[in-house]
Amino acid sequence: MTPQKSDACSDPVYTVGDYLLDRLAELGVSEIFGVPGDYNLQFLDHIVAHPTIRWVGSANELNAGYAADGYGRLRGMSAVVTTFGVGELSVTNAIAGSYAEHVPVVHIVGGPTKDAQGTRRALHHSLGDGDFEHFLRISREITCAQANLMPATAGREIDRVLSEVREQKRPGYILLSSDVARFPTEPPAAPLPRYPGGTSPRALSLFTKAAIELIADHQLTVLADLLVHRLQAVKELEALLAADVVPHATLMWGKSLLDESSPNFLGIYAGAASAERVRAAIEGAPVLVTAGVVFTDMVSGFFSQRIDPARTIDIGQYQSSVADQVFAPLEMSAALQALATILTGRGISSPPVVPPPAEPPPAMPARDEPLTQQMVWDRVCSALTPGNVVLADQGTSFYGMADHRLPQGVTFIGQPLWGSIGYTLPAAVGAAVAHPDRRTVLLIGDGAAQLTVQELGTFSREGLSPVIVVVNNDGYTVERAIHGETAPYNDIVSWNWTELPSALGVTNHLAFRAQTYGQLDDALTVAAARRDRMVLVEVVLPRLEIPRLLGQLVGSMAPQ
């Protein structure tokens, strides 16, 4: 490989830091998020000088981690840089969320020099006990691979960590001491090696035989989820759905994984909280294929799914099962391809999916009618266009949108497993940086936005023009629905949302406050026309109203 060293860097020597950057560039990373600190400053010089990687500074480390997560979901790899101790601990929540939700993020920590560590002195940003691996040990719980780089083995260790991150689709951790970052080394001699295929021909053959026997002449029904996307098996899943008439649904975690405008798309399955048509089709399917499905509490109606294992083919990351038979090692893509081959080879066509009963279109609300949850999400969904990237924060925004069918080509991002409120605002920065040609739409509650709102200014600095809908329902409405309807701990300070962008350095924006349907309609109409500006719309909703789906989930919730 040709080294990517730039003359813009004052150091003409090719270094370990350059090696790391070139490997990240090879994996598709063209922006790195983070916050400077004295232990990483010289490494940041190399980022700035790199010919294909750009530095994107964040307002704080937590936001940088969230931004890297949003970027990684769309690009398939991302990186965040922090300083030792104080910086890396600040980003820990974001990294844990990336681990839970299978997002490949490389966390690079600038550390003290090896000589300074060797003295075991009480250096700043440490715990003062001379042990400089406390935080490395913490990282082992929330990353799939870790390395404390040493000069002699740095290249090999970088390759190991990056390979694991690429393979497992989870974060990795690299402790890069400032002197190691400057240490001379050779550039990569070959592309980062890929793991050999993880499918046993015998396992695949036995799986195929068992699947043929179970499927017979039945119509397949498919329930798919997030891991299909993370494991880059979407094309194989789409080929399976095209092999016959295959009714299919997703969980909320995998929303937008499949084309929701397809006549064969049933909707969102959420256990007992599902629409009855969806629940009956999934739970009553003669043969159900579950692809990349993880039944978490918040997407399964608190584990109310009723799936018969005897009629289920379950496709996982490294193994699959047919009824009670398990086959491994068997990669997801290979198992999906085998099922598609079975359907195309059996020479029969399944009947078309019966469409739901036609319903009269809802009456258009009066322009002076106060906003409701249903009005807001209906109108937001009608404003979406192919290519939009929609991020819905964990709350009324996420569950309000989950029930709505999205146009083809819209990507939906939420965080229903980790559920860290405020995540989506910085993640929207990362998503917009990853694909600036696709307009980002952020849907977030007032309480969640107060946690991470500093990143509004980053949108402006980076020349991004998202549409941001802030749901002002005067506090933590989801928590009020669960417990403490009038409790003071669910109250928040009221902010002037329409003035906030200017205070945070946004220079090219429009801001609206909508209390009625007409005001919301006007604001979103302007937002659609002004793609050159950030448009913030504050929508004022009753403090106790929640979307239908969220109400059903809360009603079935038991103390966990």
Curated annotation (Swiss-Prot):
One Pfam family cited in the UniProt record for this chain: TPP_enzyme_N
Disulphide-bridged cysteine pairs: none
InterPro entries: DHS-like_NAD/FAD-binding_dom, PDC/IPDC-like, THDP-binding, Thiamin_PyroP_enz_cen_dom, Thiamin_PyroP_enz_TPP-bd_dom, TPP-bd_CS, TPP_enzyme_TPP-bd, TPP_PDC_IPDC
Segments of this protein annotated with the region Thiamine pyrophosphate binding: 396-478
GO molecular function, one term: pyruvate decarboxylase activity
Residues that coordinate or bind thiamine diphosphate: 61
CDD domains per the UniProt record, alphabetical: TPP_PDC_IPDC, TPP_PYR_PDC_IPDC_like
Binding site for Mg(2+): 446, 473, 475
Hydrolase keyword on record: no
GO cellular component, as recorded: cytosol; plasma membrane
GO BP term, pick one: aromatic amino acid family catabolic process to alcohol via Ehrlich pathway
Keyword match Metal-binding: yes
Stated regulation of activity: Allosterically activated by alpha-keto acids and the corresponding amino acids. L-leucine, L-valine, D-valine, L-isoleucine, L-phenylalanine, D-phenylalanine, L-tyrosine and L-valine are activators (with L-leucine and L-isoleucine being the strongest activators) whereas L-tryptophan, tryptophol, phenylacetic acid and indoleacetic acid have no effect.
Keywords associated with the record: Allosteric enzyme, Decarboxylase, Lyase, Magnesium, Metal-binding, Thiamine pyrophosphate
Domain of life: Bacteria
Transmembrane annotation, as ranges: none
Group of enzyme by EC: lyase
Miscellaneous: Was identified as a high-confidence drug target.
Name of the protein this chain belongs to: Alpha-keto-acid decarboxylase
Source organism (scientific name): Mycobacterium tuberculosis (strain ATCC 25618 / H37Rv)
